[in-house]
């Protein structure tokens, strides 16, 4: 009898410890809601980039943003917004597809493909990209902390 009691207690403690160490998962319905919320933020961000809506971008981008362009140039939030404000960088259109959003508690990773038309300095460019960006929830709201895009080779 004593061995059975020790076995039951050991099993309960082991399963409790395993549950405590398991990563927190967002319930299915909540995860889907957050994924939709992040996708809407992405749409607003792209529209704000095209429309040079600096107020919206200031709200959507984290102060510690790392924005890596497909050229390899890295901007901070301040330098990215300054380039848009000055007209040095002007997005003409941004079309996206194959968007996937994955939520991990207070973080979300977005991946996808895009077609970018942009004026950078005196150059007008149009090219396809693959991108990854990361959102985190801070002070009750989602902000983008990282963007990285890679040009897709034209075939």
Task: Label the model's feature ranges.
Residues 1-4:
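Positively charged n-region of N-terminal signal peptides that target proteins for export
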Residues 6-15:
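Bacterial N-terminal signal peptides
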Residues 19-60, 64-155:
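A beta-strand edge to alpha-helix "cap/lid" segment located at domain peripheries
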């Amino acid at each position: 009898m004593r061995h059975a009691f020790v076995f039951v207690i050991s099993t309960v403690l082991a399963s409790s410890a395993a549950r405590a160490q398991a990563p927190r998962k967002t319930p299915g319905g909540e995860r889907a809601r957050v994924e939709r919320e992040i996708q809407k933020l992405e749409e607003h961000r792209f529209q704000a980039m095209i429309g040079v809506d600096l107020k919206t971008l200031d709200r959507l981008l984290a102060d510690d943003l790392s924005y890596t362009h497909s050229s390899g140039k890295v901007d901070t939030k301040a330098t990215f917004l300054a380039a848009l404000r000055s007209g040095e960088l002007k997005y003409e259109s941004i079309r996206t597809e194959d968007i996937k959003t994955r939520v991990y508690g207070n973080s979300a990773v977005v991946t996808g493909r895009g077609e970018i038309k942009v004026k950078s300095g005196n150059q007008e460019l149009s090219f396809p990209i693959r991108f990854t960006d990361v959102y985190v929830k801070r002070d009750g709201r989602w902000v983008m902390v990282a963007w990285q895009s890679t040009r897709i080779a034209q075939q």
